[in-house]
C-alpha cells in the first residue's frame, strides 16, 4: 500500500475543500491515488458538502423528540439555507435522527470548539494524572495524550460521536450526506437534552 503523506492530504484538500480527516480516509481507501480519492469523496458527497459548508444557514426548524419512556426529551435547532429544504420530510427525519442520537448518547457539547478551554484543560490534567499513576514516563504521556483527547472529544461532542445506528460514520458525516443530498448547507445550531431527575 502506498504511503499517505501530508502533501497528498494537502493537495486533496485544496482540490476538494473536504476536511483533513476525510481526505486522509479517502487516500487510505484508495491506495494514495489522488484521482480515485477525489472520486471516492464525490461518491460519498463529502467534496460537495465541503464546498457548501461556508454558506449561511438562515432557515431551519426546531425538531423535538421524546423517548418512549417519557423520561428523556431533546430539542435540536437544525438550520438550512432555504425554507424549501427545512420543510422537507427528509430534513425532519434528519432532525429526528440527531435527536435520538442526543437522547441515546448524551453529548455534552455540540463540537470541539464549544468545549470551554478550562474544561478541556481539566480533562487533560486528569488524563495526565491517570497515565502517571500507571507509571508512564513524561515522553510517553505526551505521545499518548493526543489520542486520549481525541477519544474524549469523540465521546462528548455531538458532531464527533459515532452515529448510534451506524458506528462507521459520525454525526458530522450524517450531516455531510444530507448536504450532498439537498444541495445546500445544513448546520446543527444547538441542542438541549432533558432527563427526569437529571441534568
Swiss-Prot record:
The gene is tsf. GO terms for cellular component: cytoplasm. Belongs to the EF-Ts family. It is found in: Cytoplasm. Residues 82-85 are annotated as: Involved in Mg(2+) ion dislocation from EF-Tu. Associates with the EF-Tu.GDP complex and induces the exchange of GDP to GTP. It remains bound to the aminoacyl-tRNA.EF-Tu.GTP complex up to the GTP hydrolysis stage on the ribosome. Keywords: Cytoplasm, Elongation factor, Protein biosynthesis. InterPro entries: EF-Ts_dimer_sf, Transl_elong_EFTs/EF1B, Transl_elong_EFTs/EF1B_dimer, Transl_elong_Ts_CS, UBA-like_sf. This is Elongation factor Ts. Its main location: cytoplasm. It comes from the Bacteria. It comes from Leptospira interrogans serogroup Icterohaemorrhagiae serovar copenhageni (strain Fiocruz L1-130). Transmembrane segments: none annotated. One of its GO terms (molecular function) is translation elongation factor activity.
Amino acid at each position: 500500500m502506498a504511503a499517505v503523506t501530508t502533501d497528498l492530504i494537502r493537495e486533496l484538500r485544496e482540490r476538494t475543500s473536504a476536511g483533513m480527516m476525510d481526505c486522509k480516509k479517502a487516500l487510505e481507501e484508495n491506495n494514495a491515488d489522488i484521482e480515485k480519492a477525489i472520486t471516492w469523496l464525490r461518491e460519498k458527497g463529502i467534496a460537495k458538502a465541503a464546498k457548501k459548508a461556508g454558506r449561511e444557514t438562515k432557515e431551519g426548524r426546531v425538531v423535538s423528540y421524546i423517548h418512549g419512556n417519557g423520561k428523556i426529551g431533546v430539542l435540536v435547532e437544525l438550520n438550512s439555507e432555504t425554507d424549501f429544504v427545512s420543510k422537507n420530510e427528509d430534513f425532519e427525519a434528519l432532525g429526528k435522527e440527531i435527536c435520538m442520537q442526543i437522547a441515546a448518547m448524551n453529548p455534552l457539547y455540540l463540537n470541539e470548539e464549544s468545549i470551554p478551554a478550562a474544561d478541556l484543560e481539566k480533562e487533560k490534567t486528569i488524563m495526565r494524572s491517570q497515565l502517571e499513576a500507571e507509571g508512564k514516563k513524561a515522553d510517553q504521556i505526551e505521545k499518548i495524550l493526543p489520542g486520549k483527547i481525541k477519544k474524549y472529544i469523540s465521546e462528548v461532542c455531538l458532531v464527533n460521536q459515532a452515529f448510534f445506528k451506524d458506528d462507521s460514520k459520525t454525526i458530522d458525516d450524517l450531516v455531510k450526506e444530507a448536504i450532498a443530498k439537498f444541495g445546500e448547507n445544513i448546520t446543527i445550531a444547538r441542542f438541549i437534552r432533558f432527563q427526569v431527575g437529571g441534568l
